[in-house]
UniProtKB/Swiss-Prot annotation:
Coiled coil: none annotated. This is UPF0227 protein PC1_2487. It comes from the Bacteria. Pfam families: UPF0227. It comes from Pectobacterium carotovorum subsp. carotovorum (strain PC1). Gene3D superfamilies: alpha/beta hydrolase (3.40.50.1820). InterPro entries: AB_hydrolase_fold, UPF0227, UPF0227/Esterase_YqiA. Belongs to the UPF0227 family. NCBIfam families: PRK04940.1.
Length: 180
């Protein structure tokens, strides 16, 4: 089972395309939709939904995958639910770049600081990060500096922020998923 979390643009056709691509790894790909506007509510909703999916799945090696803002959530929710994560161009600082788009961007700071202390150290090697060298929305070098000490960084030289095609990376994602 692969759980997919969309980014801020939840209606983008790219989400459906990525779900179809992920089905080459595992036929059971489940998209969880969330508001993107209310961080605290989103956190509770995502934790509840992911936990329910894990409990009702017979896959002993589930994976959570998130793109952009979904990457912010996938890293944290995956850690808290003890499943591996793949985060694609994760929005690590939504409080800085989501102002005017969401109601309370400051809640992201609260969530980030209230997650388990040193959670990335405790999550070491359980998350794979895919970054685009041509991300027009986020500073991928900043993300690499923040995450590189804990997780494998996979660089892509073609994709932009929305990372329309993950196909070239499917074998790597599949291998990462099988590690459980």
């Amino acid at each position: 089972m692969i759980i997919y979390l969309h980014g801020f643009d939840s209606t983008s056709p790219g989400n459906h395309e990525k779900v179809l691509q992920l089905q080459f790894i595992d036929e059971d790909v489940r998209l969880i939709s969330y508001s993107t506007l209310h961080p605290r509510h989103d956190m509770q909703h995502l934790l509840k939904q992911v936990d329910k999916m894990i409990q009702h799945s017979d896959d002993d090696r589930p994976l959570i995958c998130g793109v952009g803002l979904g990457g912010f959530w996938a890293e944290r929710v995956g850690f808290l639910c003890d499943i591996r994560q793949v985060i694609v161009n994760p929005n690590l600082f939504p409080q800085e770049n989501m102002g005017g788009k969401i109601d309370r961007p400051e809640e992201y700071v609260d969530i980030a600081t209230k997650c388990v202390a040193n959670f990335r150290e405790k999550n070491r090697d359980r998350c794979m990060v895919m970054l685009s060298r041509h991300d027009e929305m986020l500073d991928s070098q900043r993300s690499a500096q923040m995450l590189g000490a804990y997780y494998e960084i996979v660089w892509d030289d073609i994709q932009t922020h929305k990372f329309k095609s993950i196909s070239p990376h499917l074998q790597r994602i599949k291998a990462f998923k099988t590690l459980g």
